[in-house]
Amino acid sequence: ILQLWNSSITEKGSISIKGLSICDQFFLGQMWNSFIQGGTYMKAKKTVAIGMAALMMSGVFAGCGSGAGNDSDSGNVSLTIFQAKIEANDGYKKLIKEYEEKHPNVEINLEAVTGNDTAATLKAKMQSDPPTIFAVGGFNDLKDYGDVMEDVSDLDIMKHALSGTTDMFTKDGKIYAVPLYMEGYGFVINKQMFEDAGVSVDSMMNFDGMKKGFDTLKKKIDDGEMKDKYPNLEAVMEYPTKELWIAGDHDVNVALTHDFETANDAYGADTLPGTGFEDYKKMVDFQAGYTTNADNTANLNSVDYTASLEGGLAIERVACIKQGNWVAPAVETTDAEVLNKLDMIPYSVPGYSDGKYFVGVSGYWAIHSKSTDEQKKVAKDFINWMLTDSEAQKILVEDCKFIPPYDNFADIKATDPLSQRIMDANKSGNTMNGWVYSGAPNTWSQQVAGVEVQKYLAGEADWDEVTKTCIDQWSKLKTTQK
């Protein structure tokens, strides 16, 4: 209190309150009144202490502490972003620095968590120290946090959102989360290998062409014709079904898109018609058939993601894996020259998704509705700036490696060939919804569909049993999770 008093006395002996918060103005006013009434410093100090305690108990100073994140008189605003894509952290820091330089009254703190800890960490944060902006990604997030998610429908950037990208977080006509980045998957190939085998990428843009190209390369591998140039090359594909999200999430999406147009549709369905399960089988068999374990598919259940990527595609042991643009950094780290040889062809299902890439939004940001008005205003401005400013857009694409789910990034190119393929597919419309599986009952796509595929490959279940189990468990899980 004495420090505050001394710093506010002018040369003429009066008090200046310029730049002081309303809380500090109150303290000084109480001290000044005590002196005017003939008191001493100690009496003044006691007066202020008693007054402050009473007012804090009544809640008058609820917004004066540091937790409020802003000072309404000085205009300073502090907010926290809780994000879940650790690979983008450096890019986010660059964006924050740019924004803070343009807005010196704003301080943005970045917290990043990824992997299996994301959901639990966010839940703990929301209970103790809720962030202003937080990452969300699925229907459970809307269910768990919908009551504290700010309506962001009025953001200017929403006018540029690609069709369907806001569906997951739209309720009663209002949008509660901002789509941040898209991802897409198909068959990631070493195009140089195929070209050396006499197969062009353009010839494999539908299922028949892809099968013909794979057969051609397989024959040349089996005959030893590729050995001199590619000594590590063993097979056309790797299929790591130890990873339930590969045989489950992504491959079962083929079946689900037959029955549901969007994840919202799947989320609201109590039953699964199962009309696309023959196509699901076709793609499982297709992938397994081009691996070194084609004659003993049970072994595929021991092959993991790392063996297929860093120990497979990136070292040219295989020419193809079913994956998405997200594998580019790992390939670049292993062998940057191999990344430059890569391309992605569509996840073509004959007569159904020929020429289509499976894409979807896999990351969103929400704004905490209980933040102060100033924090919410800055949060909206930061997000809008990040997605509309040309320099900020470049950082998102080039540093964060994002594929934007908006139509106003037209002139910005991706830094790797896989992301560029997905960006081009978005522009041309050669896409299908790749995240319908996110509307399935909790655990269904991996612990039911993924596990059933493992049983099928191990010879422990035929495909009719796989189909029946998946359909039955959908209904059971829907009932228990309501």
Model regions and ranges:
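Conserved N-terminal structural module of periplasmic/extracytoplasmic solute-binding proteins
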Residues: 6, 12-14, 21-27, 32-35, ...
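C-terminal capping/gating helix-and-loop segments adjacent to ligand/active sites or protein-protein/ligand interfaces
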Residues: 84, 359, 399-408, 421-476
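Extracytoplasmic/periplasmic substrate-recognition and gating elements
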Residues: 101, 107-109, 197, 334-399
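Short helix-initiation/N-cap motifs at beta->coil->alpha
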Residues: 112-121, 207-209, 299-314
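Hinge/lid segment of periplasmic solute-binding proteins
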Residues: 137-186, 227-232, 250, 341-347
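Short, solvent-exposed loop/beta-turn-alpha elements that line the ligand-binding surface or hinge
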Residues: 151-163, 167, 228-231, 236-237, ...
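Extracytoplasmic/periplasmic solute-binding protein
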Residues: 176-180, 185, 211-269, 318
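Glycine-centered hinge/linker elements that transmit conformational signals in sensory
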Residues: 214-215, 266-302
